[in-house]
A protein has these predicted regions:
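Long, low-complexity, mixed-charge
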Residues: 1-116, 120
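Short alpha-helical scaffolding segments that buttress acidic/His motifs in well-ordered protein cores
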Residues: 370-371
Length: 405
């Protein structure tokens, strides 16, 4: 299956030059339902949603949003001060938000994918948490592709006003039997003064999917933005480099990335943070477990203000003789008082550690899984995650317990 345009025999596209014609056209006629009553979904698909942390029929009062192919379903939050609305409808209700937030954190001319989203109808969600409102339970959203070789084009905007807090769990996935498709997303996050926004995103794709998320965040004074990303079943080709602008004084950002890579997959997962606010800080931590694909881990910290402090840590574990991991942590200082550090490590599991654990009664598979679990323990906040999602995350280490080649 050819998914790319080839410019030459020597240069077959890896992260760009996606052949849009290899996929079905984006469906423009989007249907919206302010209820899940009309949702027709198989039990197998419900289980897949739960595995990425999205339970559509629990008792949560924070609201829900599901984009299922070209259909949108959502529930109005039962908590005062939070709203979730399909983006196109939000622009009709609040015309001013388009001027204020639409392609302000992401450049519409960044590449072909942002241009594609810009030229299409606005499909996605608008979430806003009002001033000083603290949402104590996670809000669940999902982007579910259920048609073979389809194209999903999404634009999501999240706004946290001053002093607000929210944990957003988003599952992006394909139907259990699907092989391929193209998923394009623009996400824009605006974290107001003193607010805290945690975004937990889980990807679970079929073997021939191409995925292109384009994300930007703007963080104001004393605010915190945390991005947790898990890739459980990777796409055939995923490339993303989310950008965060720490605009305010004492603004903070943390990226925590965990991914598993398998044969014939390409994962280019990065993150760039511009520390423009005085005494702003950032931490980028990435862990990759490679079973035979190609992984590029990048992280760029830009210190542009007095007192800026940051650290980037990219590490990879090779579980097979095949596959590639490239760790590319980067630092750029444009202010004399910015202080930044980085580290990177790539290797295989030490057989001595496996032998030691076996001497304590574990078999080889259990020992390897335990070591990988420790490698992946990077301090991600798990409060509020459903048990199904916690089990999915644990499976990354358990899969590794099948041994090395």
């Amino acid at each position: 299956m050819k998914l790319y345009k080839s410019k030459s025999k020597e240069k077959k596209a890896k992260t760009t030059d996606v052949d849009f014609s290899a996929f079905n056209e984006i469906e423009e006629n989007v249907e919206t339902y302010n209820s899940f009553d009309n949702l027709k979904i198989e039990q197998e698909e419900m289980n897949a949603l739960k595995a990425v942390g999205v339970n559509l029929f629990d008792e949560s009062v924070a609201g829900k949003f599901l984009m299922y192919g070209n259909k949108i379903y959502w529930l109005i939050p039962q908590i005062s001060g939070i709203e979730i609305i399909p983006l196109r409808e939000a622009f009709q209700i609040y015309p001013e938000i388009k001027e204020k937030y639409y392609f302000k954190a992401v450049d519409k001319d960044q590449d072909d994918f942002t241009q594609t989203v810009y030229k299409r109808e606005q499909n996605g969600y608008f979430i806003r948490v009002k001033k000083n409102v603290h949402v104590d339970v996670p809000l669940h959203t999902a982007m579910f592709m259920h048609r073979e070789m389809s194209t999903m084009c999404v634009h999501n905007i999240v706004v946290l006003e001053e002093g607000a807090s929210l944990h957003l769990i988003t599952g992006c996935l394909s139907g259990c039997t699907l092989q391929g498709g193209l998923h394009i997303t623009v996400g824009e996050y605006y974290v107001g003064k003193g607010a805290k926004f945690i975004s937990t995103m889980v990807h679970d794709w079929g073997p021939e999917f191409v995925v292109r998320p384009r994300t930007g965040a703007i963080v104001e004074d004393d605010a915190t933005y945390v991005s947790n990303y898990y890739s459980v079943n990777p796409a055939r080709d995923i490339q993303m480099n989310p950008f965060t602008h720490l605009k305010g004084k004492n603004a903070n950002a943390k990226y925590m990335t965990i991914l598993a890579s398998f044969p014939d997959t390409f994962c280019d997962i990065g993150g760039t943070v511009l520390m423009d606010g005085e005494n702003s800080g950032a931490e980028l931590v990435a862990r990759a477990v490679n079973h035979g694909g190609k992984v590029i881990q990048t992280g760029l910290l830009i210190g542009a203000a007095k007192g800026a402090r940051a650290h980037v840590d990219c590490s990879g574990l090779m579980m097979t003789n095949k596959g590639i991991i490239e760790a590319v942590p980067g630092l750029r200082s444009i202010h004399p008082d910015a202080r930044m550090s980085h580290e990177a490590a790539i290797g295989r599991i030490d057989t001595g550690e496996v032998n030691y654990l076996q001497s304590k009664g574990l078999d080889e598979m259990q020992a390897v899984a335990l070591i990988v679990r420790g490698f992946l323990d990077i301090g991600v906040e798990t409060e509020g995650l459903d048990p199904e999602l916690e089990r999915t995350i644990q499976e990354i280490s358990e899969l590794s317990g099948h041994g090395e080649d």
